[in-house]
UniProtKB/Swiss-Prot annotation:
InterPro entries: aa-tRNA-synth_I_CS, Arg-tRNA-ligase, Arg-tRNA-synth_N, Arg-tRNA-synth_N_sf, ArgRS_core, DALR_anticod-bd, Rossmann-like_a/b/a_fold, tRNAsynth_Ia_anticodon-bd
Signal peptide location: none
UniProt EC number: 6.1.1.19
Annotated organism of origin: Bacillus licheniformis (strain ATCC 14580 / DSM 13 / JCM 2505 / CCUG 7422 / NBRC 12200 / NCIMB 9375 / NCTC 10341 / NRRL NRS-1264 / Gibson 46)
Membrane spanning stretches: none
One Gene Ontology molecular-function label: arginine-tRNA ligase activity
Record's keyword terms, sorted: Aminoacyl-tRNA synthetase, ATP-binding, Cytoplasm, Ligase, Nucleotide-binding, Protein biosynthesis
Protein name stated in the entry: Arginine--tRNA ligase
Amino acid sequence: MNIVEQMKDVLKQEIKEAVMKAGLAEESEIPEVVLEVPKDKSHGDYSTNMAMQLARIAKKAPRNIAEEIVASFDKGKASIDKLDIAGPGFINFYMNNQYLTKLIPAVLEAGEAYGETNIGGGERVQVEFVSANPTGNLHLGHARGAAVGDSLCNVLEKAGYEVSREYYINDAGNQINNLALSVEARYFQALGKDKPMPEDGYHGEDIKEIGQKLADEFGDRFVHEEESERLAFFREYGLKYELGKLREDLENFRVPFDVWYSETSLYQNGKIDQALEALREKGHIYEEDGATWFRSTAFGDDKDRVLIKKDGSYTYLLPDIAYHKDKLDRGFQKLINVWGADHHGYIPRMKAAIEALGYDKETLEVEIIQLVHLYKNGEKMKMSKRTGKAVTMRDLIDEVGLDAVRYFFAMRSADTHMDFDLDLAVSTSNENPVYYAQYAHARICSMLRQGEEKGISFEGNLDLTKIGSEKEYDLLKVIGSFPEAVADAAEKRIPHRITNYIFELASVLHSFYNAEKVLDPADEEKSRARLSLMKATQITLNNALKLIGVSAPEKM
């Protein structure tokens, strides 16, 4: 807990003490103290609606209650300069903000660890995200899911959760058979032989590349081979190629995974039969019309679900249940799936399966990623100008740069449709949020370099009483709220809370820079103190940018 959080706790306790001292309520009757930061700075540093909350208990008008709380309040302990009452009974607190300077040495000492909290308490969380079929390039929805999923993992780790990042490889379904048939057609075509593409084939450039690669490497060897053997080889070859490309793309996007989990392994290791048997033992399976059904309506689903069809083939749901059972068997306490919007209707049946297996259905959380629309020159863009095909993640990174893609995708709530303005993403103006944030970091680094060049160091003992202007305190307040922003983003699963924080920190930094001189030739101690404030800001901004996978340049 940093100094800002400590002081808020002291203030909350002193408000309770004042309530009891005024005889307005017993300690057990006092509601939780809520402290808000007023939008208008002239209304103080914090405000509470405690008087309104107590009106029913104290049987008095909120304004009168507020007056009694103020009269009984001990200003000394909570570092308060003054209090006043606004409107129907809001109490505003004006802090003696010198206490904020204690943040500077604390942030400098913490370094990369600044912002860490332990609200997660080491809870084991598995986040499964992206999990795109290994049959083509990653599209914009995958890119958004990758950015959101990775940022969420970073935030959860910073907040004290033990996180495992997992990619589920859909390598067992019909789409892999179609991949093999598509590769076969492109292989024959690369050899100049006629072979039509399958009806549900994949027409991407990558499939042509695989066909050409096979032709170059093996010549016409497979033309004369047994079809089943040829397709088995093409299946493995194509899968390996596509997976290699996916891994490379995600690595370049700064999205690491701890586990790449193969769907095929569920079949090989008997996990599907085990899951089916577990549900059967608990009485949640029945046979009807030659099919095997899961009684999911018993757990809130709108209809029962087929697991094994009449022809003996599995529906998608059965291996998915087996996969989620395996996740739980591995000891994860919370499962977070980051899914595309087309999976929304799938949530109730998966939660039903979790509950049917004997777990709390809330163990599974699903974050939905909504669609992305690209705009250029104010017009919606459907196809890549370069390829004439749907825009891929690679295309987008080539167009606007990696940092812009990561920042923009982390910037909005995942469950809202996103309009991605390509022109804004490459502009070098304050309207571009990633430029605004990175420029703030580069600006701080420039100030630190200037101090170094002039031989002014912030190492050693500092006179932090030299820090005292309104702009400096504004900066310290935002720096001090970083651990709270991390905790909030983690608890609510909203990584975009961090981009909001970054924008706020960059704003107060630019405002400080425009109003104050960091290096004062007439006062070296003041310069040293301000350089230490700049270093604390740089550490905080760098740590925040790292959470969303965005670089922090030292020069721009």
